[in-house]
Design a protein with these regions (language model features):
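Glycine-rich beta-strand-centered segment in the early N-terminal region that forms part
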Residues: 30-48, 56-100
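Mid-domain Rossmann-like dinucleotide-binding core that forms the NAD(H)/NADP(H) cofactor-binding site
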Residues: 125-202
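Short helix-loop-beta connector
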Residues: 117-121, 143-149, 213-215
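C-terminal hydrophobic helical "lid"/dimerization subdomain
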Residues: 2-4, 278-334
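A structural motif shared across PLP-dependent enzymes of the aminotransferase-like
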Residues: 97-110, 283
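Short amphipathic alpha-helix with an adjacent loop that forms part of the alpha/beta core around
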Residues: 203-214
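Glycine-rich phosphate-binding loop and adjacent beta-alpha segment
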Residues: 226-300, 334
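Short, well-ordered loop/turn sites that connect or cap secondary structure elements
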Residues: 87-88, 144, 235
Length: 334
């Protein structure tokens, strides 16, 4: 194995509130010779996702915190450069959780083979990857069925737009809220949402009353905060809440008070379920078959915001909290 020099992004300090570039550093490293039963991979694309913000904090959660001075982790799709394991050969395309770096060495068990058929290969980080699977699983968690009226917050994001498209394919009426008219048009014209509105124009609760005066059956929550409170008022009796994310509060220095109308859960007999996609990895093959089929048939669109180069990876991550992405935010590394 020839000498390989790689760059990686490390966490240098824990953010307080909104992360800043000084919390991160770009470090150049030289990879060690490739051991037996290991694989050398060059990353082509890496993912940046809002959930990563939680891993930058100390404290116990469903996934360990990032360590100070160590490279960050996250979804990536790459190409095998060299292999000393029988499971892979040079040229194979794989996904992994070793993002935030240009090259890495890993055991075969930590790599997931994928086909070159999907283009661009960053699809495996978006609609055909964990964000797409999160949307798909969310509809299972929410027991979404034909005829349901489904409201999705953060609807133009990576998970939200796929959730809306899948709900439409299931025969639902779909409403989405987002943060600009550009994104409203994207939801209506490209994703097929029945209704989309800009939450910045006026109170979400009031806009929902106008757009869906008879209420909603399902709320797919990517935001929390005002959107959750509005949904609790708009939900019909026996409505369901899919608790997927809460990006409105990820950078809060102090916890914010919860919705003032939680009592609606009792009076309306609502169901609220949390969602962590890794709990559903035994269904990944089923997801790939169904959603991959939709994509190949032209029934599912994939939208990306692409940032070029590892030097701009932190910028891409911070942009998630400023609404800079339409669809999935990815960083092209090679």
């Amino acid at each position: 194995m020839a000498k390989i020099v790689s760059r990686e992004i490390r966490l240098t300090s824990r953010p307080i509130g909104m992360p800043i570039t000084a919390n991160f550093s770009v470090v150049q490293t030289e990879l060690k010779p490739l051991p037996d039963q290991q694989v050398l991979v060059r990353n082509l694309f890496m993912s940046v996702d809002p959930y990563m913000r939680g891993r930058m904090n100390e404290g116990k959660s469903y996934v360990p915190s990032f360590k100070i001075g160590q490279p960050l982790e996250g979804g990536a799709v790459g190409e095998v450069v060299e292999s000393r394991a029988k499971e892979f050969k040079p040229g194979d395309v794989v996904t992994s959780n070793f993002g935030w770096r240009e090259y890495f060495i890993a055991a075969p068990k930590d790599l997931h083979p994928v086909s070159r058929e999907a283009q661009p290969l960053s699809l495996y980080l978006g609609a055909l990857g964990m964000t797409g699977m999160t949307a798909w699983v969310g509809l299972l968690v929410g027991e979404v069925k034909a005829g349901d009226v489904v409201y999705i917050s953060g609807a133009a994001g990576a998970v939200g737009n796929v959730a809306g498209q899948l709900a439409k394919l299931r025969g639902c009426r779909v409403i989405g809220s987002t943060g600009s008219m550009e994104k409203v048009n994207f939801l209506r014209e490209e994703c097929g949402f029945d209704i989309a509105f800009d939450y910045k124009v006026g109170p979400v609760a009031e806009q929902l009353k106008v757009e869906v005066p008879d209420g909603i059956d399902v709320y797919f929550d990517n935001v929390g905060g005002e959107a959750l409170e509005a949904a609790l008022s708009a939900l019909r009796v026996h409505g369901r809440i899919i608790a997927c994310g809460g990006i409105s509060a990820y950078n809060d220095e102090k916890p914010q008070p919860g919705p003032s109308n939680l009592f609606n859960i009792i009076t309306k007999r609502l169901t609220m379920k949390g969602l962590i996609v890794r709990d559903w990895l035994d269904r990944q093959g089923e997801f790939e078959k169904e959603v991959g089929g939709y994509f190949r048939a032209g029934k599912l669109k994939n939208k990306e915001t692409v940032v070029i180069g590892i030097d701009h990876a932190v910028e891409a991550f911070l942009g998630l909290f400023q609404g800079n992405n339409v669809g999935k935010m990815v960083v092209k590394l090679a």
